[in-house]
């Protein structure tokens, strides 16, 4: 059952074609990763799904969509608790406090609830950003290179944390990254975006839960090479 359906999607900016005639589907609870070079249209695709940009074509997405941006999209003048509470104004005070408490626990930051973003590490700030998106109980979560600015150790920890959350909550996730290893490790499917259109699709068959050790397997490295070649293929 498709939770996201895109048909013949095109996006233009002042005469520039950012996406051209793109088709896409994601099943309910599926984790789909999209890889592509800078300027290939990855972020534009997410923005179209979230209806942040004008487009032509057909997009069917549930109304309740959460988004985690490429750069830390948290309010620096709000504490961790206040950031998670943002947008929950229609809830009762008691319900809002319950949601915030649950998502601080989910983010493993209960002891940092009164800290401001400047007092937290990059990984902690990104956990707050994800917890805030999840606090609204979205059916679909769009993630735009959320770990691109993190060091390798923190990124690996965040990948495992995200998989733990996905396993528990089974949200439909569309995850954009330039990191092929990250895409293979996280996703059920990896799509390659090149020259403003999808040029490759790879089913990831590694059993879940996944462990870092799969990154050293022959199958993993074969997939990585195939995706790399697709990513760097040019039509002459």
Show the residue positions of the predicted features.
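Conserved signature/switch motifs of ABC ATPase nucleotide-binding domains
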Residues: 115-118, 136
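Helix-to-loop junction immediately C-terminal to a conserved catalytic motif
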Residues: 50
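Short coil-to-helix segment of the ABC ATPase nucleotide-binding domain corresponding to the Q-loop/switch region
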Residues: 78-85
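The feature captures the beta-strand-to-loop junction immediately N-terminal to the Walker
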Residues: 35-37
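Catalytic Walker B motif of ABC-type/P-loop ATPase nucleotide-binding domains
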Residues: 141-144
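Conserved ABC ATPase "signature" region
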Residues: 94-112, 164
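Hydrophobic anchor residue at the start of the ABC signature
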Residues: 130
């Amino acid at each position: 059952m498709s939770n996201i359906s895109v048909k013949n999607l095109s996006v233009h900016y002042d005469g520039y074609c950012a996406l051209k005639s793109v088709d896409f589907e994601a099943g309910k609870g599926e984790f789909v990763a999209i890889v592509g070079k800078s300027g290939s249209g990855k972020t534009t695709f997410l923005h179209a799904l979230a209806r942040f940009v004008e487009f032509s074509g057909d997009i069917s997405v549930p109304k309740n969509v959460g988004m985690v941006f490429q750069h830390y999209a948290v309010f620096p003048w709000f504490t961790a608790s206040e950031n998670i509470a943002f947008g929950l104004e229609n809830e009762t005070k008691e319900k809002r406090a319950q949601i915030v408490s649950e998502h601080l626990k989910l983010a493993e930051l209960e002891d940092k609830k009164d800290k401001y973003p400047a007092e937290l590490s990059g990984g902690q700030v990104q956990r707050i950003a994800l917890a805030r998106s999840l606090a609204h109980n979205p059916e679909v979560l769009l993630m735009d290179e959320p770990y691109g600015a993190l060091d390798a150790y923190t990124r690996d920890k965040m990948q495992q944390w995200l998989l733990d959350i996905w396993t528990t909550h089974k949200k439909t996730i569309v995850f954009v990254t330039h990191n092929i290893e990250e895409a293979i490790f996280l996703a059920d499917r990896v799509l390659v975006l090149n020259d403003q259109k999808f040029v490759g699709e790879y089913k990831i068959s590694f059993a879940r839960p996944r462990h870092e050790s799969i990154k050293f397997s022959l199958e993993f490295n074969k997939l990585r090479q195939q995706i790399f070649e697709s990513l760097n293929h040019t039509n002459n």
